[in-house]
């Protein structure tokens, strides 16, 4: 890792402000706000371990505050174990230790806990879920169930354990990837229990406590949980119209020993960004140059409304620098719980041994059904895409009609609409929405840096009548929330 003796940027006001990102907008005394902003910058990796923070007087001048404010902020960070104050040497960001592992344990699985909570609430109280991007089943799931039962009966004399996956399913996945431009053999495919297990396996196999991982910001919440669970230090990179910001990734790779980059190049969750071929080439080259592993999540790749997504990043990589993961749950049925990992055989063998420790192999009946579905994929997927295209247009129209201040870009594929609030907090709105019978995912839950609390991720996977009723409930919640905001502003005005 580079820059172990480097100060936090050149010490200029604009550079520090960029790293602290609007620190003064918080609540409480100035030194509390500054400490919170510095803590967040350290946790998201904008300020790396071993970095010397600016001298108190210089930072005070750059931020237009008193020196005592910076002194108090640094003291607070030292008390939390985030920095060390060295006599005559300044204030330094501490290496990863017990604090980071504790923080990982505290924050891990928050999205899963939230999902379990809202699912339970949904069942008990009849709330409409606009929370999870889990589609209902295609008709072929029911149609092929009898044929799957016959196949299961045929193989029932076998013990049923295939740690790497049911061979016919591995063959079908390999064919599908090859057709998408990534030449793949059956021996390079590992079947997993959904893409979530695939992500968790890469985290367990390749990342240890204190090691650096780059995640998109925003990104799939389950990926944040999986990599936090390892005790990794997460460095966030913003997502634009063409995917993860590769200029920033290049800078991060130059100054930190990054173990792994997680990216969703095809209809990114939640922004629906699509990475073009040139950027895929570039990311593969960056990973190869720096000896960093790319884990690309292709769960939404086949859900293009118009032009097909480019080939996976692994198609442009040499050697073992890219691992590709995917899911059949997003295409055929959320309850199918079948995912996969594609990697060079030596890497796959390592992942397969690790998966065997977890479960000895995924459910055979689901795999048998998945293989039959893939055999008819060219017939089934266009039907699913037309359904999603229609529901995406409907959801966009509903949001524009009932929530006219909310903004969004029309997705070209995938499963979700990434909406921006005109003001306020999506986390606070989520509580009001729940009271009004609608469950939503605040944007902050998609962010490893806890940003995007002014966004809401809205899936368009539900039936049209459910989408319409859900948005109407959300609109009532938004009106109620805006009324609360107005009352708070008036109370603050009176106090002032």
Task: Tell what function each PLM region has.
Residues 65, 343, 418-423, 440-479:
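Conserved PLP-binding active-site segment of the aspartate aminotransferase-like
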